[in-house]
Amino acid sequence: MYKIMKKLVKIVCCNIIYRVKYIGIEKIDNNKKYVICPNHSNILDPTFIFPIVDNLSIMAKSEIFKNKLVAKILKRYRVFPVNRKERDVKSTLHAIECLNLENNSKLLIFPEGGIIKDSKEIRKKVKNGAVYISAESGVEILPIFITRRPHIFQKVYVIIGNSINIPKEIKQDKEKIKEYSTKMINNIYDLEKIK
């Protein structure tokens, strides 16, 4: 069922609703673990990543889990909630557990913590969770840039960057985690220049 859903999402979201072009897809090694970190400007952003990677878990805002039916469907496809308004230790621990499920487990986190609509907010909003999880788990971050706020039937570029190693020793250093988080978000938006 999971593979069928991946194919369906690719056809509907990546070929019909939008025309998605992947750049740097060869940088994804599906035999490896990654903390996948894209920018976020569109509710459908996860559907551009879902078809191209294996064993993906997705961290999503807790608000979308209020509907029981929606929550049941999301959990079936390894989507789990995070409370964005406060430090959510439970979700952070669950994220690390997800990376330990299989040898090639992957975790999708939007490091901006939500959809960024205003272009003035680009590069200014970044949360530290992705870098902390990467440092704690020893799993590299894979930065990805997705075309911002595309119109329906428009071409969408999904640009994959080189993976980033986060030193394990910084996990207890708040300033270092913040520093690496800022570098990461800049790295993500710098990928836009490649297209």
What is the role of each PLM region?
Residues 5, 65-70, 151-153:
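Short, glycine/polar-rich helix-capping loops at beta-to-alpha or helix-loop-helix junctions
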Residues 13, 51, 74, 99, ...:
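A generic structural signal for well-ordered alpha-helical segments
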Residues 26, 40-41, 62, 85-86, ...:
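Short, flexible active-site-adjacent loop segments at beta-strand->alpha-helix junctions, enriched
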Residues 30-86:
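Catalytic core of membrane glycerolipid acyltransferases/transacylases, capturing the structured
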Residues 86-92:
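Glycine-rich anion/phosphate-binding loops
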